[in-house]
């Protein structure tokens, strides 16, 4: 190769001293032919040298780390992104010895991308021409980024302990929950901006970064599912038995609810750590003040009693406030109410009267309400992103978007949820059991949609399950329900998943059962199931004929959507003290 370079150097020097036009015609042809031949030879030598160089450096497709990386990425939805992102890491060959290593590297790369997005949003906030809603939406993005970073860090910690600290099934469910929530956060950020020209420029500035992180999270989720599914299959085979949960029920409660929390949820006499009373007879006059004063990062249950009264405020239980419990004096006596809404400049995310993010949150005997009304469009009464959270004897009252089951694992029992359009929506793994779900009278020309589930990826362990509940109309809608068609749900996102089972459905529900979101969007990729429902609106003969809709006839398939299976209820629900059923 050195000789070739020397030749071209001399050739260049020669040509610079002699004009090619002065060379005789035959010699000129010979010269050009020789020159072209040498170029080809040089190119071939260069390619061979490059290949040999890569072989010598160990960056070889036959190397073990390359095979592990390629195999791991092949299970993802975006394999090229998966491979290129990790292959670009310096000395990746020394770090990859297993699929677990690939996943951990992917999570660390994703964390860096999330941090990059954070600084991009901070830069956007310095713009002077932002609207009120754009500012609110950008702050929503900062909040969801903060949550995403926590989820990625927790996933790395869980992965480092895999598969020893917990059962395989617990590891699998926890990891899939964390990555599903991290993915959901990226869409939540973008959902805060409308698609119209008024604030499209801000959304466009964010979109590439958010979508990139969402794809990276999707890849990590797919690899986690592939790894844990494989390991559990090996365990089943080696043990020659079906892998089961360590504890399926504790007196009918999911096991993640400790005996102490079960008592708290059902006991009529509980000693609180703080008391809220609007008349000044407690420690605090507002719920928000009591939450702010609660210990952060607590591992013990911290109980806030909210005395009877109407509390006109917006309450946030942040991620730092863990294991908080609200106890009211009765669902008709303790009411937390607000009226934030999208029409007046809020985002859907920030419109919530009460927003709960802190892990292990419990509430009982309270009403969460948004009084904005149907003309104000999205106006959330309760938003929940708290993992392992549960609500008992609570009312959620609003119109459009009443209950926002945003992310993570959630359980609602003996609750009333009332609204109009998409009034139970989000991308949590949420089970509503023994609840009353009532459609209200909407604005003229509107249709009622009970659910709008937001699953964006086929590997997310999310969905809305309504079990052993009652679906009907409120007293204001019932006399005129024929004028307002009501459906069980519509697909908000591409892989929307909702199951209604063992519930009573009145004639309020349209015979088709389900409604489109926008034309054919998601009709082939959604999962809508019905199992053993009763009532005048439960007949399935007139239901939609979409590829994604099914009548579930197998008890085994239905069992997958019970609290014990769908939200890993056997590991945590028992601690709440709320009454529940884990199975069918």
UniProtKB/Swiss-Prot annotation:
Expression triggers: By ethylene.
Annotated S-S bridges: 415-435
Keywords: Aspartyl esterase, Cell wall, Cell wall biogenesis/degradation, Disulfide bond, Glycoprotein, Hydrolase, Secreted, Signal
Residues the UniProt record annotates as site (Transition state stabilizer): 400
Pathway, per record: Glycan metabolism; pectin degradation; 2-dehydro-3-deoxy-D-gluconate from pectin: step 1/5
GO biological process: cell wall modification; pectin catabolic process
Catalytic residue list: 401, 422
Entry-listed glycosylation sites: 108, 129, 226
EC number: 3.1.1.11
GO CC terms: extracellular region
Signal sequence extent: 1-42
Name under which the protein is recorded: Pectinesterase 1
């Amino acid at each position: 190769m050195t000789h070739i370079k020397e030749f071209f150097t001399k050739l260049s020097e020669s040509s610079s001293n002699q004009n090619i036009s002065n060379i005789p015609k035959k010699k000129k042809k010979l010269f050009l032919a020789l020159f072209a031949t040498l170029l080809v030879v040089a190119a071939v030598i260069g390619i061979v040298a490059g290949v040999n160089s890569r072989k010598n450096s160990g960056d070889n497709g036959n190397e073990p780390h390359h095979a592990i990386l390629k195999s791991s990425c092949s299970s993802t939805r975006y394999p090229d992104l998966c491979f290129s992102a990790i292959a670009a890491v310096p000395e990746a060959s020394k770090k990859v010895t297993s699929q677990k290593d690939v996943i951990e590297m992917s999570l660390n790369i994703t964390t860096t991308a999330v941090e990059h997005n954070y600084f991009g949003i901070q830069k956007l906030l310095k713009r002077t021409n932002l609207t009120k809603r754009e500012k609110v939406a950008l702050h929503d993005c900062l909040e969801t980024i903060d949550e995403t970073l926590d989820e990625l860090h927790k996933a790395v910690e869980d992965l480092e302990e895999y598969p020893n600290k917990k059962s395989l099934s617990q590891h699998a469910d926890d990891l899939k929950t964390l990555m599903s929530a991290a993915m959901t956060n990226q869409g939540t950020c973008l959902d805060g901006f409308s698609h119209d020209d008024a604030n499209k420029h801000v959304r466009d500035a964010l979109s590439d970064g958010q979508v990139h992180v969402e794809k990276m999270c999707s890849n990590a989720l797919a690899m986690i599912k592939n790894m844990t599914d494989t390991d559990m299959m090996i365990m089943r085979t080696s043990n020659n038995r079906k892998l089961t949960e360590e504890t399926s029920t504790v007196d009918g409660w999911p096991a993640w609810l400790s005996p102490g929390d079960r008592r708290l949820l059902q006991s009529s006499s509980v000693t609180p750590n703080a008391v809220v009373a609007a008349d000044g007879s407690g420690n605090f006059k507002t719920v928000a003040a009591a939450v702010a004063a609660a210990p952060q990062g607590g591992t013990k249950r911290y109980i806030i009693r909210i005395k009877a009264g109407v509390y006109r405020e917006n309450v946030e239980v942040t991620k730092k406030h863990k294991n908080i419990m609200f106890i009211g004096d009765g669902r008709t006596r303790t009411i937390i109410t607000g009226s934030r809404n999208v029409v007046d400049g809020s985002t859907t995310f920030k419109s919530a009267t009460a927003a709960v993010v802190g892990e292990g949150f419990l509430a009982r005997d309270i009403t969460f309400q948004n009084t904005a009304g149907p003309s104000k469009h999205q106006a959330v009464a309760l938003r929940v992103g708290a993992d392992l959270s549960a609500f008992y004897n609570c009312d959620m009252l609003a119109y459009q978007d009443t209950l926002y089951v945003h992310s993570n694992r959630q359980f609602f029992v003996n609750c009333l949820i009332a609204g109009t359009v998409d009034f139970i929506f989000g991308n949590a793994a949420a089970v509503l059991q023994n609840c009353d779900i009532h459609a209200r009278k909407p604005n003229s020309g509107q249709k009622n949609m009970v659910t709008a589930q937001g699953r964006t990826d086929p590997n997310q362990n999310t969905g809305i399950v309504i079990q052993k509940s009652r679906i009907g109309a409120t007293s204001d809608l019932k006399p005129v329900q024929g004028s307002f068609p009501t459906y069980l749900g519509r697909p908000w996102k591409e892989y929307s998943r909702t199951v209604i089972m063992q519930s009573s459905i009145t004639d309020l529900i349209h015979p088709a059962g389900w409604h489109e979101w926008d034309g054919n969007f998601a009709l082939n990729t959604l999962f809508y199931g019905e199992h053993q429902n009763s009532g005048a609106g439960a007949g399935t003969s007139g239901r939609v004929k979409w590829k994604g809709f099914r009548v579930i006839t197998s008890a085994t398939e239905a069992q997958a959507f019970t609290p014990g299976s769908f939200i890993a209820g056997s590991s945590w629900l028992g601690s709440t003290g709320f009454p529940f059923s884990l199975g069918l």
